[in-house]
């Protein structure tokens, strides 16, 4: 790896960890799911490790899947801890008060929200955090979300992304509708603002009609950092045009290199440099002094997932397929029905099963800890070797760390893996800037609405 090549590291914060068995792990603390001090302790640990950001994934439904699927699987659902039990904007605003440097990122869907509301929320969060906010832009494919917003089914794939593109464009205009320096607050002159620096955007499009301006000053970062996680063709196009960070699930180095090259190769037609997009594959890390001890941690937590829930979860990831009709200790059938949910994630999981000849039981044990992301175990050196190889061979610019069980696995990562990366000179030893854009090496966007001076 080149001497100046630094990797970026964030982490996904789900209550007791991303593994569905994580809440049952001996050191887990599921009783603290709504305790702000619990969240603060873990985020401060990540900040001690100089990580770029904390990511709170969000959904506007309690469970995944259709109403019928949920009704059939009530008991199975009760075997798993919910992925979230607090609304993320409120939680991140609280965490901003107990942290100084780490970025704070959350999800908001373009399918069941309005641009003005999202522009206002993220601009406010960016001010509260002093420039540390990020928006993970998603389009909703979860039927449970559709059912919470008066729909019998979700919006079709292509339509979701068309709406998302316009949605993001409107939000950008709204963030830029109040120029830097628009508010003079001149007490002597009796003039609070400059009308020439406050703009009505007057957007009229296929999906939205928005006059503006925003009633929040321009964010400290200009725009909060835009994150995107879709790996389908429309998702990669959206990322190439608008995203600054991409979360992705890639199981192999070859797949990672192909995705990296593909999504960055689409950017030039939008007038963007590939340096302005950070590709961060998700990875679940089990680290210990020996490889066998690390693997034992993986096996322990994997065996804590009840079969009924494992089948339900795998069924949802594969597109609501009834897996109970198949032998749990046999292979995944070749002729699976069409997917109803995320097509790219389904493909990752099917390829994993075929490549490693996994039974259905082995497959749900693998994905219950990662939802299609890569799981690795080993010593700090072995983990760092893999990280370094992926960045050196342009399969990643860094990683979105998925702690399997909390708080222990975050402590392990910060105490053992981070020092090894720092020793190699490929991860920072101190924060060098104050904003999330600074951490990621991203420039502050120019104002698209302001007239040239």
UniProtKB/Swiss-Prot annotation:
Keywords: Flavoprotein, FMN, Monooxygenase, Oxidoreductase. Signal peptide: none annotated. GO terms for molecular function: nitrilotriacetate monooxygenase activity. Belongs to the NtaA/SnaA/DszA monooxygenase family. PANTHER family: ALKANESULFONATE MONOOXYGENASE-RELATED, C2H2 FINGER DOMAIN TRANSCRIPTION FACTOR (EUROFUNG)-RELATED. Heterodimer of two subunits, A and B. Hydroxylation of nitrilotriacetate. This is Nitrilotriacetate monooxygenase component A. It comes from Aminobacter aminovorans. The lineage of its organism: Bacteria, Pseudomonadati, Pseudomonadota, Alphaproteobacteria, Hyphomicrobiales.
């Amino acid at each position: 790896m080149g001497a100046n090549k630094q990797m970026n590291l964030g982490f996904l914060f789900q209550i007791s960890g991303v593994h569905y068995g994580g809440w049952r792990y001996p050191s887990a603390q599921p009783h603290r799911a709504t305790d702000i001090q619990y969240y603060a302790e873990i985020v401060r640990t990540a900040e001690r490790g100089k990580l770029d950001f904390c990511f709170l994934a969000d959904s506007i439904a309690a469970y995944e899947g259709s109403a019928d699927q949920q009704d059939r699987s009530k008991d199975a659902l009760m075997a798993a801890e919910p992925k979230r039990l607090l609304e993320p904007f409120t939680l991140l605003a609280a965490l901003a008060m107990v942290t100084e440097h780490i970025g704070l990122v959350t999800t908001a869907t373009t399918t069941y929200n309005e641009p003005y509301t999202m522009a206002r929320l993220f601009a406010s969060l960016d001010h509260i955090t002093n420039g540390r906010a990020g928006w993970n832009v998603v389009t909703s494919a979860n039927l449970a979300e559709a059912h919470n917003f008066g729909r019998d089914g979700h919006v079709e794939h292509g339509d979701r992304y068309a709406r998302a593109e316009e949605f993001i464009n409107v939000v950008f205009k709204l963030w830029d509708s109040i120029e830097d320096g628009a508010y003079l607050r001149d007490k002597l002159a009796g003039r609070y603002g400059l009308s020439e620096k406050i703009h009505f955007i007057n957007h009229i499009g296929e999906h939205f009609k928005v006059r503006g301006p925003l009633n929040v000053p321009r964010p400290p970062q200009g725009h909060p950092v835009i994150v995107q996680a879709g790996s389908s063709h429309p998702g990669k196009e959206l990322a190439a045009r608008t995203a600054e960070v991409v979360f992705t699930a890639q199981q192999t180095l070859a797949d990672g290199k192909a995705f990296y090259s593909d999504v960055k190769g689409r950017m030039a037609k939008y007038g963007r440099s590939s340096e302005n997009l950070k590709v961060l594959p998700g990875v679940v890390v089990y680290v210990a002094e020996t490889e066998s001890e690390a693997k034992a941690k993986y096996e322990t937590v994997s065996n804590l997932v009840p079969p009924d829930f494992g089948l339900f979860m795998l069924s949802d990831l594969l597109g609501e397929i009834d897996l109970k009709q198949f032998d749990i200790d046999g292979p995944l059938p070749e002729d699976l029905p069409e997917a109803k949910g995320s097509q790219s994630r389904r493909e990752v999981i099917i390829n994993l099963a075929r490549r490693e000849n996994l039974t259905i039981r082995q497959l749900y044990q693998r994905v219950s800890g990662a939802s299609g992301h890569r799981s690795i175990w080993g010593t700090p050196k072995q983990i760092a070797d893999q990280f370094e190889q992926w960045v050196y061979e342009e399969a990643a610019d860094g990683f979105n760390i998925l702690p399997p069980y909390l708080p222990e696995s975050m402590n392990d990562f910060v105490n053992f893996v981070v020092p090894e990366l720092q020793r190699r000179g490929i991860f920072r030893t101190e924060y060098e800037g104050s904003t999330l854009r600074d951490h990621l090496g991203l420039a502050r966007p120019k104002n698209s609405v302001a007239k040239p001076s």
